[in-house]
Amino acid sequence: MILVIDNYDSFTWNLVHYLMELGAEVQVVRNDAISAGQAVTSGAKGFLISPGPCTPNEAGISLELVGACADAGLPLLGVCLGHQSIGQHFGGQVVRGGLMHGKTSQVSHDGSGVFAGLPSPFTGTRYHSLIVDAVPDALVVNCTSDDGHVMGFRHRELPIHGVQFHPESIATQHGHAMLANFLRICGMPVKALA
């Protein structure tokens, strides 16, 4: 089961739908309806922190869950606000980066983590005004946009991954493949799409 932390964002349900299409059992809880301790002892094989309209400091258990997953060595994927929460937890700065609502960018990656087996570059859809800047040493930047911003990173040693853009957007290429890679990181089977 994948436990999805919903940061009160409609994009959460698109992510859930994609995960379910790939064969995952998914449980969704709001960011203020569970503690990080309850989350990591829920039996979930992996965790996804959703996008949301606020900052990591205002995102319920999101920051605390990053730490709990890190302590337990559990797989975690952060999308947009979730990505920012991972970056901030490990010592990065979350700063204003210009309004990018529904804009596409070419994103280039190194083929690691959730980007394994994907062509580079591809189109990613961005819905954000904040970005992670000054990425800490614990995280490896593995994806950048054509305008030079960090679009993805992975932890050097832990199964923790973040993407700034939205894999669940219809305008993002290879969204299902990125989420399938995350399910594999979680040790879960992946259903082939027709």
Predicted regions mapped to residue ranges:
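Extreme N-terminal starter segment of soluble prokaryotic enzymes
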Residues: M1-L3
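Phosphate-binding/catalytic loops
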Residues: I5, P121, G162-Q173
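Active-site-adjacent helical/loop segments in soluble small-molecule enzymes
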Residues: T12
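Two-component/phosphorelay signaling modules centered on CheY-like receiver
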Residues: H17-E25
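Short hydrophobic/Thr-rich beta-strand motif most characteristic of the beta2 strand and flanking loop
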Residues: E25-N31
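Cysteine-nucleophile active-site neighborhood
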Residues: T41-A116, T123, L179-A180
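Catalytic beta-strand/loop cores that center a nucleophilic Ser/Cys/Thr
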Residues: G111-E157
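Acyltransferase
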Residues: I170-A194
